[in-house]
């Protein structure tokens, strides 16, 4: 009976290596498709897999062919419509189509639809939050926040050719060939010694010598059939993400839920905060999040109430800033914590309250936070709150502000606010 032993790590997913190579090769096109797809999802469905489409021309192999542009001279036998020097107009319409669903119809021509494939939840989130980090993160005395970094982790039997370890593969090849031929080599050595003795003995034993020479030839043939290198010998450099303890961090999420925030504006604010939550939980470990909702009064709430509560009212933005300052003083020592804040509002505020917001941020919050981001979600002209915050942006480097007009702006604004800088972690 013959037994087959499958030693592949990806036995049930044999194309995993090719899949990873494909994701790396077309990362730019995939990320572009993801940035477009995220705006089409519901508020609660941003962390599942995604069907990604790539234009066929982006994945086609390069090839040389005759160009279709410019002027050409051709001879058309039997032509009765044109004479020499006539210019032939280019055909109008689809002209073959690209399969993208755009353009006009054509009665002839061929094309291909865009290439569509499914990526997993982990692949989706990895690409979604690639090259993002908390700005100005500082290593404090008490280290509880864990950041994941890529490290060498020995060797693996599966991988891409670029990561192959030649030395380790040859060592495995030598060990395998030694183990598979050791017994035969011992037997061969014994037969050669016997043949030497018989050859020197008198009288000559020709039949015995012939038998020994035949056995020696068969053994050498068996030894030579053992391959020099086998797929079982190949070893690849392995990399894995390991937790890297860095520092303590807390993120304050301040959301305006006043009456001026219609449901569409609130949904866009929630999308931004869900992206922020997924980014923090995906990239860091043990980071704390403080949720604050405000209208005329501010209130610290849990995650469920922050996203689903229907409470509303007037607008006094300073109430949220005052509550944040109180929470910082009570629970988060700036010497031990990296403090971050993300504020989302439609910019509508009581006029006399906007200067107070400027004062609280300038004197109390911005001196102690690592990074403060303000996101204004509106299609109207900016009001007093935006203008007061513009003065802060020109004074404080750790203050950033962005404008979201519609749903398509959410992800680009998020990446702009949290793109990875050259020196994110400071000692």
Swiss-Prot record:
Region Disordered: start-end pairs: 84-110
Composition bias type Gly residues, residue spans: 92-102
Record-linked HAMAP family: UPF0229 (MF_01232)
Family stated for the protein in its record: Belongs to the UPF0229 family.
Protein name: UPF0229 protein YeaH
Species classification: Bacteria, Pseudomonadati, Pseudomonadota, Gammaproteobacteria, Enterobacterales
């Amino acid at each position: 009976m013959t037994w087959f032993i499958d030693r592949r790590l990806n036995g049930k997913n044999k194309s995993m290596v090719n899949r990873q190579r494909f994701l790396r090769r077309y990362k730019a096109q995939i990320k572009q498709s993801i940035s477009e797809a995220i705006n089409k999802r519901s508020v609660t469905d941003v962390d599942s897999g995604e069907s990604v489409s790539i234009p066929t021309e982006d994945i086609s192999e390069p090839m040389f062919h005759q160009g279709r542009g410019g002027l050409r001279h051709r001879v058309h036998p039997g032509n009765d419509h044109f004479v020499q020097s006539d210019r032939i107009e280019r055909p109008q319409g689809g002209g073959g189509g690209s399969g993208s669903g755009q353009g006009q119809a054509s009665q002839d021509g061929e094309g291909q639809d865009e290439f569509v494939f499914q990526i997993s939840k982990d692949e989706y989130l990895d690409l979604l939050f690639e090259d993002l980090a908390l700005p100005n993160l500082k290593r404090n005395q008490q280290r509880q926040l864990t950041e994941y970094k890529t490290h060498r982790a020995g060797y693996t039997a599966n991988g891409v050719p670029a990561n192959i370890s030649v030395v380790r593969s040859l060592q495995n090849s030598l060990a395998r060939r030694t183990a598979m031929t050791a017994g035969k080599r011992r037997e061969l050595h014994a037969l050669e010694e016997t043949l030497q003795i018989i050859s020197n003995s008198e009288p000559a034993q020709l039949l015995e010598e012939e038998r020994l020479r035949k056995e020696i030839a068969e053994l050498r043939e068996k030894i030579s059939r053992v391959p020099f290198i086998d797929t079982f010998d190949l070893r690849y450099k392995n990399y894995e993400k390991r937790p890297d303890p860095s520092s303590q961090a807390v993120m304050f999420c301040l959301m305006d839920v006043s009456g001026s925030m219609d449901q569409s504006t609130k949904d866009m604010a929630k999308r931004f905060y869900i992206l922020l939550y997924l980014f923090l939980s995906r990239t860091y470990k043990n980071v704390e999040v403080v949720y604050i909702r405000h209208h005329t009064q501010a209130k610290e709430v849990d995650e469920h109430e922050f996203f689903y509560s229907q409470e509303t009212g007037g607008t006094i933005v300073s109430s949220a800033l005052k509550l944040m300052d109180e929470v910082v003083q009570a629970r988060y020592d700036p010497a031990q914590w990296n403090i971050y804040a993300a504020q989302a509002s439609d910019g509508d505020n009581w006029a006399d309250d906007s200067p107070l917001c400027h004062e609280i941020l300038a004197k109390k919050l911005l001196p102690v936070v690592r990074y403060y981001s303000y996101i204004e979600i509106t299609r109207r002209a900016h009001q007093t709150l935006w203008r007061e915050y513009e003065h802060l942006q020109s004074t404080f480097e750790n203050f950033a502000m962005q404008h979201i007009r519609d749903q398509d702006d959410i992800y680009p604004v998020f990446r702009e606010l949290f793109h990875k800088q050259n020196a994110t972690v400071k000692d």
